[in-house]
Amino acid sequence: MRYLVTAGQACLALLLAPGLVGLIRWMKARLQNRRGAPVWQPYLELQKLFRKEVVVSRNASWLFRAAPYVIFASAVATTALVPVLVAPAALDRMGDLVVLVYLLLLGTFFLALAGLDPGSAFGGMGASREVTVAALAEPTVALAVFSLALSAGSTNLGQIVVATLADPARTVSPGHALAFAALFIVTLAETGRLPVDNPATHLELTMIHEAMVLEYSGRYLALIQWAAAIKLLVFFALLGNLFVPWGVARELTTEGLLLAAASFLLKLLVLAVTIAVLETRVAKLRLFRVPELLSVSFVLALLAVSSSFLLR
């Protein structure tokens, strides 16, 4: 039964991810006094891209064609490890912090290789920037979640949720707040949101993620965009269910699963509104200021770990 719930959780993430991106776009447009595209616009864009012909550069190798599938598969795999509806889940023994970080790095690694493969100037520039951001961001993800693992006594994501549900007082600890702030900053960087990157631009010299996918078209581009939306949802799930796990089901009952789904949707809505408001209030940072922001998040995560050690 737990395997069915895990499969349903992955399918739910696949279905909700494009809508989450569309919701953020729609709310940003409303906050800027624009009508904006409908929430379901990303679904229409994916449908259009899957129907389009694939155009590949003559200089591209097999790696360029294989990368979108690896990126998409790694993103889908993370949805099965993160506790979304129930904890512990069927793949709980494999849902370790280290596995999650390496799956996230796998997608970033192949995306950077795909940007370098055709030999275009924009792709190489974006790949170098993406690797720089990932080198600063991924250790912060590990440290932020590790601070929670210290309190729970396990690096298993499901066990962290169960331990937090058993002792709700730890959610108001200083280490908890510092880890949440660190992971929130990393979420902005890893998903290409403002102030680190602007997801609405395609021809800026300062772009990061979009520079690596300029050579892609058709179903390859659709898979990469879908994977990026799934990655955003996974980070939202980490922020919502690891730090505020109320609503996550501990038993496989119909009422518990429905409550878990409703609470998860509510958390997604709150985080989407937060991102939309933030992106309408802040400007994009200069590229050389991005490492400074990520260094702040790393220090916050380090303080969270130190706080967890001191307050044990």
PLM feature spans:
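Alpha-helical transmembrane segments
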Residues: T6-L20, D92-L105, A169-E190, L257-A260
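Transmembrane alpha-helical segments that form the membrane-embedded catalytic/substrate-channel core
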Residues: G19-M27, G107-G115, A181-N198, L269-L278
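Juxtamembrane inter-helical linkers in multi-pass membrane proteins
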Residues: N33-F50, N198-Y220
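Cytosolic juxtamembrane amphipathic/interface segments immediately preceding
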Residues: E45-F64, A121-M125, V213-Y220
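Transmembrane alpha-helix boundary signature
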Residues: V54-S57, V76-D92, L111-S120, L150-N156, ...
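Juxtamembrane/interfacial segments at transmembrane-helix boundaries in multi-pass membrane proteins
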Residues: A89-R93, S147-L178
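Mid-bilayer segments of alpha-helical transmembrane spans in multi-pass integral membrane proteins
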Residues: V99-A114, A135-A152
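Interfacial loop-to-transmembrane junctions
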Residues: T274-L300
